[in-house]
Amino acid sequence: MKYGIALFPSKRIQDFANSYRKRYDSHYALIPPHLTLKEPFEADDQKIKEIVKELRKIAAETDVIPLKVTKFSSFYPTSNVIYLKVEPNETLERLHERLHSGILADKSEYVFVPHITIGRDLPNAEYADVYGQLRMQNVHFEETVDRFHLLYQLENGSWTVYETFLVGGKEQE
């Protein structure tokens, strides 16, 4: 089965992101606005049990996660992805590192750029027009997130939560 690890921002940020995603993101119906912490990976039932145990340990040792969204940005020319930029911070960086070491070790395909995608798979002309307008807008959200999620992919391509991990020394619900 295919799994991934992400955190979901507040409803306020999700609503803001979705106001763009419904028009510009081909994955709009597959997953809510999120910040990917670990790209999709394959794991069998036994392996996922080990991973869940490790994720509980990581969560217990992770502080609440500050999120500061500051602007629209893009991965152009690598891809026509438009996103909300999340300012890197020590807690987020450390969490990302821990999710790519030990039994979770892998070769990450990309450098970690914390972001929330709002547009993808746009033709070049549409990308240029949309990004040209968005990058002029002021964006500012600040909050803390107290959980991250192990997700799994359903047959229709959508993602759903397998387990939620509370950070900051909070007890699991």
UniProtKB/Swiss-Prot annotation:
| Entry annotated with the keyword Protein biosynthesis | no
Q: Tell me, what's a Pfam family for it?
A: 2_5_RNA_ligase2
* UniProt motif HXTX 2: location: 115-118
Q: Name one GO molecular function term.
A: hydrolase activity, acting on ester bonds
InterPro entries assigned = 2H_phosphoesterase_YjcG-like (IPR050580), Cyclic_Pdiesterase (IPR009097), YjcG (IPR022932)
**Keywords from the UniProt entry:** Hydrolase
Q: What is its EC number?
A: 3.1.-.-
Which NCBIfam families does the entry mention?
PRK13679.1
UniProt family annotation:
Belongs to the 2H phosphoesterase superfamily. YjcG family.
Q: What is this protein called?
A: Putative phosphoesterase GWCH70_0799
